[in-house]
Amino acid sequence: MTARFTHTDEGRSEESWAASPLTGLPGAELSDRDGVPLRHLVVLAAHPDDETLGAGGLMARAATLGAAVTVVVATQGEASHPSSPTHPPERLAALRADEIRAAAACLHPRAEVILLGLPDGRLAAHEDAVTAALRVRLDEPGTVLAAPWHLDGHTDHDAAGRAAAAAVIGTAARLLEYPVWAWLWAEDADIPWDGAVRLDLDPAERDAKAAALAEHTTQVGPLSPEPGDEAILLPGMVARFERSFETFLDAERFAGIFERLHAGVADPWGFRDRWYERRKRALTVAALPRERFRRGLEVGCSIGVLTADLAPRCETIVATDVSPAALAAAAQTVAAAGVGLAPQGRVDLRRLRLPAQWPEGEFDLVVVSEVGYYLTAAGLDLLADRILGSLSEDGVVLLCHWRHPMTGWALDGDPVHERLRGRLGLPVAVRHVEEDVVLEVLTRPGVGSVARETGLL
């Protein structure tokens, strides 16, 4: 991933942020997804100081509420000063371990600090280890997990966010993601505001956060007067974390939009009754270049109408959605179509927040239909990366989206396809464009035409 910033960038000003939707956000809900009030706060930090910058006020609030706090630190930040003439990585790691213990004590007197000791700058290769370390700490009712935003723009932060999203699958833990470096580079369109919440901090909580940040001396001040020992957190950056509130991205709020939609209307988009939708589904299925696929993935299945049409073409298909109501309706749709559900049947319905969460295994078919608009540009990039990481050598990707403006969302179909197509970098086998809809089929290099694959040529 190309870096969007350096730590010396001034970035977006606080004045600009003050004019953004940031100021009108709803309050954070400090409970698990079942509504049990906060009892255990688990804070994931990619590096020592992330916990203070992104969730220091939340940690102080947990102390006030009598909740336990566990800080899981993925790396010890030994690569923060790669050109330091005075502090080799081993010394920095030791110093930063001491700093985070002192900082955590400022925020919560009984905070437990767990150092995983994974390599700084290479966390993406160790996401499973982070997920495993978190998962064993998320079982208690009333657990909230705070973690770096998975689209923060720093490779370690993004990896930590993905690991956290994987860890909460199958638990009641609420995931609150905190931006850090995004405050430098992001514009309003880069932030998924529908999921954003704020935690207003009282003066004592702000003081505790300031004291904790001061403990990270290797980051807020120079290591020495020598070149290469300069401070990492410059005053302009620190100002983002001196606000009277902290900002989190709550996946449950974003999912709640679709949950309310599906709970209120049996078929929110008229999939069953509208000729436009029935014709588009027929085009979608007809565009698939093979008669049968081993294992398919449908990103955002809604009530399962397309799922039921795709299932006969797949030995198994994983269909995902963020909404439990949508998945319940999808189960009924699939059953009515005479297609069985996993584990005995071929349709595996899963509640996942893609692309932050992602199903295991390999797929030779991935269908992204009418969901790309709901992601930011960075989210589309991550979706493409996830697809490429799980697409078989003979894999096929189908994209299908409405081309007219999407009220309330930044993107419509054409820019969604342009972004995904560019990031995937796969040959386009089919491109069907109408005034209303764009449908494209992309394949791995070497996948032949239908005629070639079926022996006509």
Where are the predicted features?
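A short SAM/SAH-binding and catalytic strip from SAM-dependent methyltransferases
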Residues: 365-378
